[in-house]
């Protein structure tokens, strides 16, 4: 096995297990009692084994004990590996906590994620879609176009660590490459680490953020004390040499500033070519990390909504307009798209993006969607279609207002299958039917489940 476990802890017991199935987050599940060495008082107790796959016989070390279950980590594969086991592509896998499924075949990863979504829909809402759509897959392994990377200076060793947190730990593990990070970013990690190591103020740097647009790359340095002029100049020369945008952030988001602002505005850009729209964004703005999955997702959302020229669409949690602008293209100049987002800064960004694309039919409003918004004029105009793309907490507070919107079709984009299923149950009570659903492999090699679902109004219900 390729570095898929940390060093053993001698004080923790090791046992042999027969792995039966996978948990939702990709750990092997076994039970005590399947081997003669198991303690008799533990027979029947469930064990979650990191890196183990169904059908395998493994030796695992117990890492955590609770009343009803235990957690363990595989230390040795004792027989034939599962057909779904593959070699991890990253040399840091097993120590770095970023990925959790690199040892699982990509097809099986997607199958597992679909099972998770099916299970949650059944458990929380008692429903299944009429049709499961083909999963949206990532087209490349180095899919991440942005990353926050921790920085820690060890003065006794005069060594700077640039890397990600270890699994279930706040400790940073040093990395020299990242297999899921865009190659243009990953290839520069060693040189970036050496640069930070050379700075006088390296102990004051908390993290760096790398972001990639279609044609630009930004480096953001988060520092807790002011950097001297020599350090800033070193960072500037590095960025100039690479052709990158350089940003410094000494405090909160409002303190972000671009070095050498005369070279251009504080913006990166990406396009959704299928809709002929282009977006400008700041290094701190939320954007989808996987460009190819994002474009497929937006295309599918528009197809599911079956928009016609002149229709009205409401886009809740619209961000910088990732869905709103393509939707505006679909409804044409005689239609209307209303985007709503809590952040005033993101509303301004969406408004600016609509202007740069000449989409006058798109308008945006700032509103905390967890609070009552029924008194706002935009909420009482009626819509043909509704798109919801909430954070992990879901959109439960919004569900009570859905009947008032009058939408015939709803597309719900989710990053949490549990809250999607919960909200789906409410939509069914409001007379909607779950017609189609698909999982999206936005975060390949991780347990994160992204999904998209179509609901259609099938009957009138007096709420």
UniProtKB/Swiss-Prot annotation:
Class of this enzyme: transferase
Family: Belongs to the class I-like SAM-binding methyltransferase superfamily. RNA M5U methyltransferase family. RlmD subfamily.
Molecular function as annotated in GO: 4 iron, 4 sulfur cluster binding; iron ion binding; RNA binding; rRNA (uridine-C5-)-methyltransferase activity
Binding site for [4Fe-4S] cluster: 90, 96, 99, 178
Function (record text): Catalyzes the formation of 5-methyl-uridine at position 1939 (m5U1939) in 23S rRNA.
Active site: 415 (nucleophile)
Reaction catalysis annotation: uridine(1939) in 23S rRNA + S-adenosyl-L-methionine = 5-methyluridine(1939) in 23S rRNA + S-adenosyl-L-homocysteine + H(+)
InterPro entries, per database record: 23S_rRNA_MeTrfase_RlmD (IPR001566), MeTrfase_TrmA_AS (IPR030390), NA-bd_OB-fold (IPR012340), SAM-dependent_MTases_sf (IPR029063), TRAM_dom (IPR002792), U5_MeTrfase_fam (IPR010280)
Domain of life assignment: Bacteria
Gene name, Swiss-Prot/TrEMBL: rlmD
Binding site for S-adenosyl-L-methionine: 288, 317, 322, 341, 368, 389
Domain TRAM residues, every copy: 6-76
Name the record gives this protein: 23S rRNA (uracil(1939)-C(5))-methyltransferase RlmD
EC number: 2.1.1.190
GO biological process, one term: rRNA base methylation
Keyword terms, alphabetized: 4Fe-4S, Iron, Iron-sulfur, Metal-binding, Methyltransferase, rRNA processing, S-adenosyl-L-methionine, Transferase
HAMAP family referenced in this protein's UniProt entry, alphabetically: 23SrRNA_methyltr_RlmD
């Amino acid at each position: 096995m390729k570095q898929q476990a940390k060093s053993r802890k001698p004080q923790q017991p090791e046992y042999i297990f027969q792995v039966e199935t996978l948990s939702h987050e990709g750990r092997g599940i076994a039970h005590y009692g399947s081997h003669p060495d198991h303690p008799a008082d533990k027979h029947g107790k469930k064990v979650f084994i990191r890196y183990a796959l169904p059908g395998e016989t493994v030796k695992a070390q117990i890492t955590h004990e609770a009343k009803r279950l235990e957690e363990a980590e595989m230390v040795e594969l004792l027989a034939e590996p599962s057909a779904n086991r593959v070699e991890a592509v990253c040399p840091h896998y097993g120590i770095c906590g970023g990925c959790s499924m690199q040892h699982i075949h990509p097809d099986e990863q997607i199958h597992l994620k679909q099972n998770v979504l099916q299970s949650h829909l059944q458990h929380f809402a008692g429903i299944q879609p009429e049709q499961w759509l083909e999963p949206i897959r990532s087209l490349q392994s180095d899919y991440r176009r942005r990353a926050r990377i921790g920085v820690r200076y060890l003065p006794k060793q005069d060594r700077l660590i640039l890397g990600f947190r270890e699994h279930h730990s706040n400790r940073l593990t040093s990395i020299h490459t990242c297999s899921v990070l865009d190659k243009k970013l990953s290839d520069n990690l060693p040189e970036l680490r050496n640069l930070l190591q050379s700075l006088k103020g390296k102990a004051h740097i908390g993290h760096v953020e790398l972001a990639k647009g279609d044609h630009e790359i930004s480096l953001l340095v988060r520092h807790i004390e002011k950097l001297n002029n020599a350090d800033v100049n070193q960072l500037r020369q590095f960025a100039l040499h690479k052709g990158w945008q350089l940003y410094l952030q000494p405090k909160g988001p409002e303190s972000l500033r671009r070095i050498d602002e005369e070279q251009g505005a504080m913006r990166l850009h990406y396009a959704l070519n299928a809709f002929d729209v282009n977006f400008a964004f700041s290094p701190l703005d939320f954007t989808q990390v996987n460009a190819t999955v994002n474009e497929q997702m937006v295309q599918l959302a528009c197809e599911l909504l079956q928009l016609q020229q002149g229709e009205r669409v409401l886009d809740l949690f619209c961000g910088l307009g990732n869905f709103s602008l393509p939707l505006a293209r679909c409804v044409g100049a005689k239609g209307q798209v209303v985007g709503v987002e809590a952040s005033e800064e993101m509303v301004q960004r969406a408004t600016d993006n609509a202007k740069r694309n000449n989409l006058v039919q798109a308008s945006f409003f700032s509103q905390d969607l967890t609070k009552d918004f029924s008194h706002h004029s935009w909420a009482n105009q009626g819509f043909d279609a509704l798109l919801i793309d909430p954070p992990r907490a879901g959109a439960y507070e919004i569900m009570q207002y859905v009947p008032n919107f009058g939408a015939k079709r709803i597309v719900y984009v989710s990053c949490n299958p549990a809250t999607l299923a919960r909200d789906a149950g409410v939509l069914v009570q409001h007379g909607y039917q779950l017609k189609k659903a698909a999982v999206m492999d936005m975060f390949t090699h991780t347990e994160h489940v992204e999904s998209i679902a179509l609901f259609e109004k099938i009957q009138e219900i007096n709420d």
